[in-house]
């Protein structure tokens, strides 16, 4: 599945805030090498460089469009194409940082376990993932998929990503290799202009697999059906805006 950097950065401030909150809890005062996993257009990589300096910081992504945007944004930083499902650093590093990428990989628990082996002693695995499948924004994707001329395609194959395990599952999986693990949830409430803005937000991420699977011939109708459901699920506030509630899970593991 291809991603769109242009669509993603429409809400860059809101998308970058969780990366900033995650980085604030990384207990490293200096690094020799840090890698931004699933770097996207480079907005999270930029934060790492601002904190630790450009030397030793690189980004990694599997999408050519995102990598092109990241390289244009930060020409002095190395960005590499790689598959996170199998990737490991060539030598132990200080920080492996990932903002909103691993929710797409069903076996990310196994990947986290392996990534711990790619850290120096005292190194940090820092992860943030959306935990929003029970929010109306995502429930309405499933409702739309089940109702319409595209429903047969979704009956044959679901595109819904797997729900995240409980925090205790992450803790138990990683504590054997960790000196300390911090786990927490944050619920962001983003004030957006209207229901259409919610649709624009999710078109870059969660809605994209649904639109692709519905097919080009149904894309506009699927989007319109979804928007109608979102308008009912997110009533306007007194100033006409809507609140998009967005729960996210954070994990910071320090290697023994």
From Swiss-Prot:
It catalyses: trans-aconitate + S-adenosyl-L-methionine = (E)-3-(methoxycarbonyl)pent-2-enedioate + S-adenosyl-L-homocysteine. It comes from the Bacteria. One of its GO terms (biological process) is methylation. GO terms for cellular component: cytoplasm. InterPro entries: Methyltransf_11, SAM-dependent_MTases_sf, Trans-aconitate_MeTrfase, Trans_acon_MeTrfase_C. Pfam families: Methyltransf_11 (PF08241). Its EC number is 2.1.1.144. GO terms for molecular function: trans-aconitate 2-methyltransferase activity. The keyword Metal-binding does not apply. Keywords: Cytoplasm, Methyltransferase, S-adenosyl-L-methionine, Transferase. The keyword DNA repair does not apply. It is found in: Cytoplasm. Catalyzes the S-adenosylmethionine monomethyl esterification of trans-aconitate. Belongs to the methyltransferase superfamily. Tam family. This is Trans-aconitate 2-methyltransferase. It comes from Rhizobium rhizogenes (strain K84 / ATCC BAA-868).
């Amino acid at each position: 599945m291809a991603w769109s950097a242009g669509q993603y950065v429409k809400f860059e401030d809101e998308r970058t805030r969780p990366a900033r909150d995650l980085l604030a809890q990384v207990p490293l005062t200096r690094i020799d090498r840090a890698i931004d996993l699933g770097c996207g257009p480079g907005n999270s990589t930029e934060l790492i460089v601002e904190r630790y300096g450009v030397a030793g910081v690189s980004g990694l992504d599997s999408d050519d469009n995102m990598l092109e945007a990241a390289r244009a944004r930060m020409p002095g930083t190395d960005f590499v194409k790689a598959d996170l499902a199998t990737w490991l650093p060539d030598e132990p590093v200080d920080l492996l940082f990932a903002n909103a990428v691993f929710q797409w990989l069903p076996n990310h628990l196994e990947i986290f376990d392996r990534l711990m082996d790619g850290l120096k002693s005292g190194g940090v695995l820092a992860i943030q993932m959306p935990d929003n499948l029970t929010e109306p924004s995502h429930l309405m994707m499933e409702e739309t998929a089940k109702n319409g001329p595209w429903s047969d395609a979704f009956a044959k194959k679901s595109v819904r990503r797997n729900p995240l395990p409980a925090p205790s599952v992450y803790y138990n999986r990683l504590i054997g290799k960790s000196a300390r693990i911090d786990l927490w949830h944050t619920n962001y409430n983003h004030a957006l202009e209207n229901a259409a803005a919610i649709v624009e937000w999710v078109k870059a991420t969660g809605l994209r697999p649904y639109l692709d699977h519905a097919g080009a011939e149904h894309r506009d109708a699927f989007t319109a059906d979804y928007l109608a459901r979102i308008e009912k699920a997110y009533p306007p506030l007194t100033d006409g805006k809507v609140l998009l509630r967005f729960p996210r899970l954070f994990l910071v593991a320090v290697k023994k």
